[in-house]
């Protein structure tokens, strides 16, 4: 009974985690690139 209810809640949490990380990782990378570019220009 507990195993049937767990897989339903697990994919939703995984999808949300993937969406947050998928958006956060490139944003941090982009911010780092902008900061690096400004440091090189200065």
From Swiss-Prot:
Keywords, sorted A to Z: Chloroplast, Electron transport, Heme, Iron, Membrane, Metal-binding, Photosynthesis, Photosystem II, Plastid, Thylakoid, Transmembrane, Transmembrane helix, Transport
What residues does heme bind to?
Answer: 21
Q: How is its cofactor bound, per UniProt?
A: With its partner (PsbE) binds heme. PSII binds additional chlorophylls, carotenoids and specific lipids.
**GO annotations of cellular component type:** chloroplast thylakoid membrane; photosystem II reaction center
Q: What Pfam families does its record include?
A: Cytochrom_B559
Its membrane topology is listed as: Single-pass membrane protein
Q: Where in the cell is it found?
A: Plastid, Chloroplast thylakoid membrane
Q: Does the keyword Membrane apply?
A: yes
For the biological process aspect of GO, one term held by this record is: photosynthetic electron transport chain
Residue stretches spanning the membrane: 17-33
Which prosthetic group or cofactor does it need?
heme b
One of the entry's Gene Ontology molecular-function terms is: heme binding
Q: Which InterPro entries match?
A: PSII_cyt_b559_bsu (IPR006241), PSII_cyt_b559_CS (IPR006216), PSII_cyt_b559_N (IPR013081)
The subunit structure is:
Heterodimer of an alpha subunit and a beta subunit. PSII is composed of 1 copy each of membrane proteins PsbA, PsbB, PsbC, PsbD, PsbE, PsbF, PsbH, PsbI, PsbJ, PsbK, PsbL, PsbM, PsbT, PsbX, PsbY, PsbZ, Psb30/Ycf12, at least 3 peripheral proteins of the oxygen-evolving complex and a large number of cofactors. It forms dimeric complexes.
UniProt-listed NCBIfam families: cyt_b559_beta
Q: HAMAP family recorded for this chain?
A: PSII_PsbF
The job of this chain, per UniProt, is described as: This b-type cytochrome is tightly associated with the reaction center of photosystem II (PSII). PSII is a light-driven water:plastoquinone oxidoreductase that uses light energy to abstract electrons from H(2)O, generating O(2) and a proton gradient subsequently used for ATP formation. It consists of a core antenna complex that captures photons, and an electron transfer chain that converts photonic excitation into a charge separation.
Descriptive protein name: Cytochrome b559 subunit beta
Say which species the protein is native to.
Guillardia theta (Cryptophyte)
